């Protein structure tokens, strides 16, 4: 049975980049799974695989909601996740 593919979306804080001083970071795909995404993968179990983590700063998303939403959803859809 194939694993269920998961994309994890997190903010700059949970990506380990910083707090409010880094909240203006534009959306990007993490090159390696941040620790919190690895923890999610472990918690989900063997039937799931976290295939991508998308990161975006809270302030950036809030101030650019329409364009940020399109960027983030595009990054998620590229990975063709099941969940």
Task: Label every model-predicted segment.
Residues 2-83:
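Metallocofactor- and cofactor-centric catalytic cores in central/energy metabolism, strongly enriched
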